[in-house]
Every structure is written in C-alpha cells, then in structure tokens.
C-alpha cells in the first residue's frame, strides 16, 4: 500500500514541500532563516489575534486598552510583549535572510527574489502601522512624520496625505484604518509567502558554493526538519529572554506617554529596524529627494540580479567582493546608529557619507569587483 502522504491530494502538496523535498546536502545554518520567518509570522498572527480581541481602535481609548491588556487580561502583558518583540525578531531574521541571499547570490532566482522584495515592503508597512496602534507619543508623531512624506509627491501630494489621514491631521479615522490594514496585511503576507515558496520549489534551493547541486540531494525530512527545530528553539529562547527580562529594551520610552498633538517629542524616530532607512531619508536636504532615496534603499534589492557581473554566483570564492560585502554590513550598522541620533554635527555628515557609500558599494563597487575577479581568474574570455 502506498503511503497516504504520497497519494492524498492535500498531503501530497505538504509532502513535496516539507518531507520528500530534495534539498542540497551542504546548506548551512544561514538557510534556517526561512523557516524562522515562518515561525515569526505564525507567532505574530496568533499574538496579534489575541491582542485584537481586547484592543479598541479609537483615539480616546486605544492607549487605555493597551494598558488594560497589560494589567487586567490573563497573560496580556506576555502576549503584548511577545508581539512587540516578535516584530524585532521578525526583522532580525529578515535582515539575515536577505543578507544570506545577497552573499550567496540567491537573487538569481528572479521570481523568488522579487516576491521576497515585495514581502519585505509588506512587512515594513505592517510593522509601521502596528507601531501607531498603541497611540503613544512616538506612535502619533511617527505616523504624522512618515505619512507627511507623501506630501512631497508633486501636484497630488497634499491631497494624497489628507486622503490617507481621513481628515486634516492624524486622528481617529487614521487610527481605525491603520488597525484595519494592520489586521489584514499579515494574511496577505501569508499568501505571498506561499507564492514565494512555490517559486523556490520550481528551482530548488541554492547552496553556499552557488554551484548546481542536483547530483547531491537529500530529503528535507529528517535532516533539515531537525535542523530547523534547533533553529526555532534557539530563536524562541532568545525571544523569550527578551520578553521576560528586557521587554522594553528595543522600545521607545516616549510611547508610554499618551499621544498629544500639542507636544512634540524632542527626537522623533522609528523602531530600530527602520533606522537605517530613516538615516538615508534624513541625509538628503530635499524632501522629495529624501523620500526617493528612502524607497530606493529597499528597492535597490530588486536591481541586484541585473548588477551581478561575476561568472560565479556565490561570494564564497570571491575575496574582493567579500570585503565589500562586509563593509556594506558595517555601513548599515553605522546608518542604524545615525538614524537614532539627533540632526546635528557630526551626525549629519556621517549619515550623508554612509548613505553615499551604501549606494556606491551596491551600484558601483560590487559590479566592478565582480569583473576584476573574473579577470584575475582569466574567466573573462
């Protein structure tokens, strides 16, 4: 008798995706982050669902409802902090996942990569709208500043901003629609994740060498299921340490003050995972230019397949590009630091230099180093 998992219409799909899936035998722990992101998404949807049961999306009661969740709901504090810090874990895994893709040349799977870039935008939009919901000072002013950037769009800008706000300022209408979008987007993200996996399974996984691994495949289960479980346990340990010992480490103290349109916080800044993009935005003195740079700082990922000049896919055997890659990582850390600093000397010039080098490394230096390495190997024939 044939195993039911190989014959049943539904189980067959699961079998081909997670059990009998042929996987390269040499993929390292950098390939764990896909499954970790899936777990993060599940944690966020579940904790978010339970939070939504007690949250009210009204300017008068939003802040109080979050306080009520933390004080009166059974384990409400745990659910709330798991959701808030779960977002941070989500972005840590996302950045490492994208970084892995850049290092090992996974962007040559064009469809998978482009869906991934769309997913990144969707997750960023969801996180931004979620940050507005507690209706603290930083929620309100963050929403005001970021939505206001759309007014830089010529001709339709102001109308567009007022349309998004649902009035002449960030108010009740804005909060209600942000809650609606924040609720629906994770389900759209889940659908996109399925498409992401669909495209990935068309080609099969990449591996650290960047070479074709068809000759050496192993079944996903038990080898990579057990490996993924180890990764999940490590991530959950880290998340729970954060939640139970340092729940406010990554948050902003200003968000413990109810939103007040008459009082601007001294330093308006987003959550840590947006700081690199915020630094790029602020480094350009022109409003429209800043907005374009902000969008391009993420959209540049979609250009990577076209900027690949080397005859090798991975950076594993490309020392010059490796150095540039790690300079880029350090550069992003500098941008993250600058994004959280006030707009004054010397932070302004550091931010501008870091922004220039960010785009230069990706658009100019890495493609050139790819050509140089090919020449050194006499592969440019």
Swiss-Prot record:
Family assignment from sequence similarity: Belongs to the cytochrome b family.
Membrane topology: Multi-pass membrane protein
Subcellular location field: Mitochondrion inner membrane
Segments crossing the lipid bilayer: 33-53, 77-98, 113-133, 178-198, 226-246, 288-308, 320-340, 347-367
GO BP: any one term: mitochondrial electron transport, ubiquinol to cytochrome c
Keyword list, A-Z: Electron transport, Heme, Iron, Membrane, Metal-binding, Mitochondrion, Mitochondrion inner membrane, Respiratory chain, Transmembrane, Transmembrane helix, Transport, Ubiquinone
Record-listed heme b b566 binding positions: 97, 196
Cellular component aspect of the GO annotation: mitochondrial inner membrane; respiratory chain complex III
A molecular function (GO) term: ubiquinol-cytochrome-c reductase activity
Cofactor: heme b
PANTHER family, per database record: CYTOCHROME B
Positions annotated to bind a ubiquinone: 201
Metal-binding is among the record's keywords: yes
Protein name, per record: Cytochrome b
PROSITE patterns found in the cross-reference section: CYTB_CTER (PS51003), CYTB_NTER (PS51002)
Note: Heme 1 (or BL or b562) is low-potential and absorbs at about 562 nm, and heme 2 (or BH or b566) is high-potential and absorbs at about 566 nm.
InterPro entries: Cyt_b/b6_C (IPR005798), Cyt_b/b6_C_sf (IPR036150), Cyt_b/b6_N (IPR005797), Cytb/b6-like_sf (IPR027387), Cytochrome_b (IPR030689), Cytochrome_b_C_euk/bac (IPR048260), Cytochrome_b_N_euk/bac (IPR048259), Di-haem_cyt_TM (IPR016174)
Disulfide bonding pattern of the chain: none
Binding site for heme b b562: 83, 182
Function: Component of the ubiquinol-cytochrome c reductase complex (complex III or cytochrome b-c1 complex) that is part of the mitochondrial respiratory chain. The b-c1 complex mediates electron transfer from ubiquinol to cytochrome c. Contributes to the generation of a proton gradient across the mitochondrial membrane that is then used for ATP synthesis.
Organism, as annotated: Apodemus alpicola
């Amino acid at each position: 008798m044939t195993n039911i998992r190989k014959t049943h219409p539904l189980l067959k799909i699961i079998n081909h995706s997670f059990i009998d899936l042929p996987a390269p035998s040499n993929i390292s722990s950098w390939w764990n982050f896909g499954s970790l992101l899936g777990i993060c998404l599940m944690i966020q949807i579940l904790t978010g669902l339970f939070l939504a049961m007690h949250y009210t999306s009204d300017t008068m009661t939003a802040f109080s409802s979050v306080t009520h969740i933390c004080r009166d709901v059974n384990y409400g504090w745990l659910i709330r902090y798991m959701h808030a810090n779960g977002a941070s874990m989500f972005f840590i895994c996302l950045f490492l996942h994208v970084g892995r893709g850049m290092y090992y040349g996974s962007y040559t799977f064009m469809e998978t990569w482009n869906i991934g870039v769309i997913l990144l935008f969707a997750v960023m939009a969801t996180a931004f709208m979620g940050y507005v919901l507690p209706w603290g000072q930083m929620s309100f002013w963050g929403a005001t500043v970021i939505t206001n950037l759309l007014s830089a769009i010529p001709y339709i800008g102001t109308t567009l901003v007022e349309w998004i706000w649902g009035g002449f300022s960030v108010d009740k209408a804005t909060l209600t629609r942000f809650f609606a979008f924040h609720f629906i987007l994770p389900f759209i993200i889940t659908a996109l994740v399925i498409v992401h996996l669909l495209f990935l399974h068309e080609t099969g996984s990449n591996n650290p060498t960047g070479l074709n691994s068809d000759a050496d495949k192993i079944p996903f289960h038990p080898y990579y299921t057990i490996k993924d479980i180890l990764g999940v346990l490590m991530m959950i340990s880290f998340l729970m340490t954060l939640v139970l010992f340092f729940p406010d480490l990554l948050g902003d103290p200003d968000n413990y003050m109810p939103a007040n349109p008459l009082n601007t916080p001294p330093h308006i800044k987003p959550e840590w995972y947006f700081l690199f993009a915020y630094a790029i935005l602020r480094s350009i003195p022109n409003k429209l230019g800043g907005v374009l740079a902000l969008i391009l700082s993420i959209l540049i990922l979609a250009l990577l397949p076209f900027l690949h000049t080397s005859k090798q896919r991975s950076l594993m055997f490309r020392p010059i590009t490796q150095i540039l890659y790690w300079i880029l990582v350090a550069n992003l850390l500098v941008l993250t630091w600058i994004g959280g600093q006030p707009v004054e000397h010397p932070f302004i010039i550091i931010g501008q230099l870091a922004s220039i080098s960010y785009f230069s490394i990706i658009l100019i230096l890495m493609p050139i180093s790819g050509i140089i390495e090919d020449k050194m190997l006499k592969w440019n024939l």
